[in-house]
Amino acid sequence: MSKPTAVLFCPGRGSYTKDELGFVGRTLRPGPVTDALNACDDWRRSQNRPLLREIDGAERFRPGLHLDGENAAELIYFGTMAQLEHLRERYQIVAVAGNSLGWYTALPASGALDPTSGWRLVATMAALQKQVKGGQLLTTVVDEDWQPNAQLQVAVMAVLDALQDRGADTFCDYSIRLGGHEVLAGTEAAMTELLTHLPKVKVGDREFPFRLAGHGPFHTKLCTAVSEQATQMLADLPMRAPACHLIDGFGNVHSPWSADPQELLRYTTTQQVLETFDFSACVRTAMREFQPDVLLCAGPGGSLRAPVGHCVLREGWRGLHDKQALFGSGLVVTD
């Protein structure tokens, strides 16, 4: 019996929470990913930093430790890569995409990097991003039923435009297009203004907007210095053509027979760092180009399930237009 086909989505920052404590240790198997984790912990030991295995295996979740940018990035990376080996036993993965940090995971998950080089990419970018002042927040432009709310969309754009018109001190922009959610990023002054002036919305038990702890102004021009340093530091990263299709943050497909490794590396350290990451476009491409049996949201956690679901409903994919029908369809899965 053939396996169901799937497009795999790798999660970004914020997906390793207290409920995921121990995820890496529970999921990891011997092999290249374990070898990469060994290399990671050897490096951490040499720098007198806590070992990632110890952080993952801690008795309790400590936000200051587990949500630290460098720790969080590596926990998420190794969590996804460890789970990938289990997912491949159940699904035929025809394409891979990622949300923000998840792009770095998507590269080794697709075979464009080996797992140890993928860790080096994640660790390097996380360290560089910590140097940038500013932040991200999350707001929403959908209602309780995951339907688009045009008034919210207009209101968010109006606040962004007003702050941009005020000059560099309040620079802000779309950072990630995340289904029915929007991740906005900017200077510290812009974060204060956005939290004050954006519409206050409650969807389920979540109140929007809210600041994303430990996040910098990712995917904006505020990260120009990060891009320049990453381009130099990662020039020798052994990028290769992926073994399966790879969808980038513009929704473009890089195929095994046509991908340019140097272009993948250039995109990873330049446009991907500096321009809006359109995860919604990734999901649209997955649906339109690959028509998989399922849209597979990798762990840790299930943070991508709602954004992917928003995109399915907006597309009307497979005739789905309401949340309850989507939940019953089995099209968006997490394991």
Description of each model-found segment:
Residues S110-D260:
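Alpha/beta catalytic cores of group-transfer enzymes, especially the acyltransferase/condensing modules
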Residues P108, L222, R305-G309:
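A short acidic (Asp/Glu
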Residues S2-R88, P238-D335:
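Acyltransferase/transacylase module recognition
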Residues V94-A106, S110:
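Gly/Ala-rich beta-loop-alpha elbow adjacent to hydrolase catalytic centers
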Residues E85-R90, A97-N99:
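Short, charge-rich binding segments
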Residues Q92-A95, G180-E182, Q291-L295:
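Short active-site oxyanion
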Residues G14-S15, W103, E188, G216-H219, ...:
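Gly/Ser/Thr-rich loops at beta-strand to alpha-helix junctions
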